[in-house]
């Protein structure tokens, strides 16, 4: 069997979960704030609207032959002017995901 030729290619951009959307006294766990690497303005966020997110984590018990599980989400809109996005996941992200990495995929494309 032949080995892989050339460099590995990532088909996603890394993002960091900052926390839940919140006000002074309430937090809204159905919406999460994500900082995407290399995105610093509200205009750059517009390209990521509708793109898929994946929070991948490791669980203790095996399901479907794997210890790894995934919660899928979608970028919904910008949050502020500094490149942070609001996103909705199929189930609310667990508290241990704060500060963790998410994958921001390049699809569905709107070009």
From Swiss-Prot:
GO terms for molecular function: mRNA binding; structural constituent of ribosome. GO terms for cellular component: cytosol; cytosolic large ribosomal subunit; cytosolic ribosome. The keyword Ribosomal protein applies. The keyword Ribosomal protein applies. It comes from the Eukaryota. GO terms for biological process: translation. SUPFAM superfamilies: Translation proteins (SSF50447). Belongs to the eukaryotic ribosomal protein eL33 family. This is Large ribosomal subunit protein eL33x. It comes from Arabidopsis thaliana (Mouse-ear cress). The lineage of its organism: Eukaryota, Viridiplantae, Streptophyta, Embryophyta, Tracheophyta.
């Amino acid at each position: 069997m032949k080995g892989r030729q050339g460099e590995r290619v990532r088909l996603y951009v890394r993002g960091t979960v900052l926390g839940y959307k919140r006000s002074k006294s309430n937090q809204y766990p159905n919406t999460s704030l994500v900082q995407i690497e290399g995105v610093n303005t509200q205009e750059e966020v517009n390209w990521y609207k509708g793109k898929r997110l994946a929070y991948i984590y490791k669980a203790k018990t095996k399901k479907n032959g794997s210890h790894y599980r995934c919660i899928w989400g979608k970028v919904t809109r910008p949050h502020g002017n500094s490149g942070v996005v609001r996103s909705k996941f199929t189930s609310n992200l667990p508290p241990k995901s704060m500060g963790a990495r998410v994958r921001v995929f390049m699809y569905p494309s709107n070009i």
